[in-house]
C-alpha cells in the first residue's frame, strides 16, 4: 500500500505538470485528460494512505518529485510506456497476497488503483492517436483560419443572408481554440470515491467499481 501511494503521488504531480504543458500548446483534450488523471491519482493515493493508517501504519508522501519536460505528444508517449511496464517484484502479486491474507479491504483499494492504471492507459492511447491524426494545434488553427477566410471570400456586400450566415458559421466552428473538439470528448468525469474515470457522455449511472452515484462524479470539461 505504501509503494502504491507513493507511485500515485508521483504520477499526480507529473500529470498536473503535463496538463500545464498541454494548455500552453492548446492541446485542450490532452489538458483535460491529464487534469482528470491527476485528480484520480490523488484520490487513489488518499485511499491507499487511509488504508495504511486504518491498518495501523503511517504514510509519508515523497518530499521531492522529478517532473519530465517535453511536448504533449512526448509526455503522452512517456506515460503510456510507463503504464505498459508490468509490475515488478512484490508489486506483481500485491493484490493476490492481500486476498490470501484475508485483507479484502487492502485488496479492494489496490484493485481500484490497478484498474485505474489500465483505464488511464487506454484513454492516453486514444488521446495520442487523436493528436497524431489532427496534427499540432498551431497547424490546425492555421488551417481553420484559412477555411474561415475562404468561407467569407467572394461574398458580395449584398449577398443573401443564407450564404453569408453559412460562411460565418463554418468559420467560427473550425477556428475554435480547441480544434480537436470535433472528435474528442467534451471532457472527463472522475468518481470521487475510487478514482474511476470516464469520457464525458459515456459514464455509468453508478460507478461499477464502488457503486458511487454518477451524479457525484467530478467533471473536467471545457
Regions from the PLM with identified roles:
Residues 1-222:
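Non-heme di-metal
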Amino acid at each position: 500500500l505504501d509503494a502504491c501511494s507513493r507511485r500515485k503521488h508521483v504520477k499526480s504531480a507529473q500529470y498536473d505538470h503535463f496538463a500545464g504543458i498541454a494548455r500552453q500548446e492548446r492541446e485542450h483534450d490532452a489538458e483535460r485528460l491529464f487534469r482528470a488523471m491527476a485528480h484520480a491519482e490523488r484520490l487513489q493515493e488518499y485511499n491507499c494512505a487511509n488504508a495504511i493508517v486504518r491498518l495501523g501504519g503511517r504514510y509519508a508522501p515523497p518530499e521531492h518529485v522529478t517532473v519530465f519536460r517535453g511536448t504533449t505528444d512526448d509526455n503522452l508517449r512517456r506515460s503510456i510506456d510507463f503504464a505498459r511496464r508490468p509490475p515488478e517484484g512484490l508489486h506483481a502479486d500485491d493484490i493476490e497476497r492481500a486476498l490470501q491474507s484475508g485483507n479484502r479491504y487492502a485488496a479492494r483499494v489496490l484493485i481500484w488503483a490497478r484498474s485505474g492504471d489500465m483505464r488511464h492507459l487506454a484513454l492516453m492511447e486514444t488521446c495520442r492517436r487523436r493528436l497524431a491524426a489532427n496534427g499540432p494545434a498551431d497547424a490546425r488553427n492555421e488551417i481553420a483560419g484559412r477555411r474561415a477566410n475562404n468561407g467569407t471570400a467572394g461574398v458580395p456586400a449584398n449577398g443573401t443572408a443564407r450564404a453569408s450566415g453559412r460562411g460565418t458559421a463554418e468559420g467560427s466552428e473550425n477556428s475554435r481554440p480547441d480544434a480537436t473538439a470535433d472528435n474528442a470528448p467534451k471532457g472527463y468525469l472522475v468518481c470521487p470515491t475510487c478514482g474511476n474515470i470516464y469520457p464525458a457522455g459515456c459514464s455509468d449511472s453508478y460507478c461499477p467499481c464502488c457503486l458511487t452515484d454518477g451524479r457525484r462524479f467530478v467533471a473536467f470539461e471545457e
